[in-house]
């Protein structure tokens, strides 16, 4: 028996996103006439028929998705939430509602936010699982209730989640190790900071960094990583202690967005000039440190793309009943002083997401229509 054609088949045949296929099939805005004609032609040739789930979603008066993330100390999580909003607008539907639930610290309010998502009868959940073990029971409960969960930025293995969208952590850690080893001539002491080793993404970066440093620059010493739990004061205090204890430190890898407290600690202890620093993500204060030469490079994790794709994966799962790719991994972007201005020109205005989505945290976004994006695949965008 011939397998039933899906949105994924049409998208693959045309080399476009499933969101574009959906908009074309439902005559929603944001798709050119030529693309719509191609989609209709290919869907007919493949024998595509909308399934009951797709029809259900099109007719629902209130399609609700809960977005559970950290508030964040920089623009990273604002960018993720902004990308999720863009993903919703891209479908051109007016009945998609996003309930944003944020928590201030790792694990602080995370379970309560998940419970609130289930109590509000969300159709699906996008989640940053900062404490996967404590969430395992909640996520199993969501699976039993047929509420799909997509993890964003980091994974929660063995929890029943349907997919994860994240940056390539192994590539990030390995790249940082190779560059710092080269900057230091393959000699000296290196250190790294992270939020918590219990977070899958952070642990993977550290493992990749340590392994690559040992393999490519065996004469370099790697210290015990510093856990700051995403608390700026803790990052500052612990790094001041690190610099006082190891005045010979040469290389520093900051694996998270919490780079400014670390840089300030280095500046206040007189260590900044002797350190080669690779940071993570990009925001105005960090851009200033790059321009000043205080930070050699930063590894950009493409948060807006992570958000867009997380929404698309969850929506596709609700429509098709499966995740075409349960592990979506994005390649990181390396930003240095030489390409910083070019990179910023290609990025959304850094402050825009802060003003657009900050008010949506612990709130609701709904509707699309006039704000639908063009019919390019979101994965083709520079972010």
Where are these predicted regions, by residue range?
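N-terminal helix-turn-helix DNA-binding module of bacterial transcription factors
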Residues: 1-56
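Amphipathic helical "hinge" segments at domain boundaries
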Residues: 50-112
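Hinge/beta->alpha junction and helix N-cap segments in small-molecule ligand-binding domains
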Residues: 70-79, 99-110, 131, 154, ...
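An alpha-beta-alpha
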Residues: 84, 176-216, 224, 314, ...
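Hydrophobic alpha-helical
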Residues: 125-143, 209, 227-286
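Flexible loop/hinge segments that line or gate small-molecule binding clefts
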Residues: 131-171, 283-291
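Hinge/cleft segment of the Venus flytrap/periplasmic-binding protein
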Residues: 213, 302-383
């Amino acid at each position: 028996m011939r397998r039933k054609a899906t949105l994924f088949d049409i998208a693959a045949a045309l080399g476009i996103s499933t969101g574009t296929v959906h908009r074309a099939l439902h005559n929603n805005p944001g798709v050119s006439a030529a693309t719509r004609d191609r989609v209709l032609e290919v869907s007919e040739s493949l024998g595509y028929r909308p399934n009951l789930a797709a029809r259900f979603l099109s007719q629902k008066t209130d399609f609700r998705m809960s977005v559970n993330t950290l508030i964040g100390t920089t623009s990273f999580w604002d960018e993720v939430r902004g990308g999720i909003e863009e993903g919703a607008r891209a479908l051109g539907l007016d009945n998609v509602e996003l309930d944003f639930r944020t928590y201030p610290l790792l694990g602080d309010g995370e379970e309560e936010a998940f419970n609130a998502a289930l109590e509000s009868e969300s159709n699906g959940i996008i989640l940053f699982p900062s404490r996967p073990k404590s969430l395992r029971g909640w996520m199993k409960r969501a699976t039993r209730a047929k509420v799909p969960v997509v993890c964003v930025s980091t994974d929660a293995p063995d929890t029943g989640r349907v997919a994860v969208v994240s940056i390539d952590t192994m590539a990030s850690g390995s790249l940082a190790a190779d560059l710092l080893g080269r900057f230091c001539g393959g000699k000296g002491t290196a250190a790294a900071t992270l939020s918590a080793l219990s977070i899958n993404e952070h642990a993977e970066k550290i493992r990749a960094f340590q392994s690559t440093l040992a393999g490519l620059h065996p004469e370099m010493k790697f210290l015990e990583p510093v856990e700051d739990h995403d608390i700026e004061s803790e990052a500052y205090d612990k790094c001041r202690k690190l610099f006082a204890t190891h005045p010979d430190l040469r290389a520093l890898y900051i694996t998270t967005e919490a780079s400014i407290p670390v840089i300030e600690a280095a500046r206040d202890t007189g260590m900044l000039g002797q350190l080669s620093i690779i940071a993570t993500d990009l925001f105005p204060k960090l851009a200033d440190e790059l321009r000043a030469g205080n930070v050699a490079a930063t590894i950009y994790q493409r948060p807006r793309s992570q958000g867009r794709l997380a929404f698309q994966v969850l929506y596709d799962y609700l429509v098709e009943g499966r995740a075409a790719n349960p592990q979506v991994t994005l390649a990181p972007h390396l930003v240095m002083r030489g390409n910083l201005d070019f990179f910023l020109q290609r990025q959304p205005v850094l402050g825009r997401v802060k003003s657009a989505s900050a008010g949506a945290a612990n709130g609701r976004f709904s509707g699309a229509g006039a704000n639908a994006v063009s019919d390019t695949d979101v994965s083709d965008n520079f972010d």
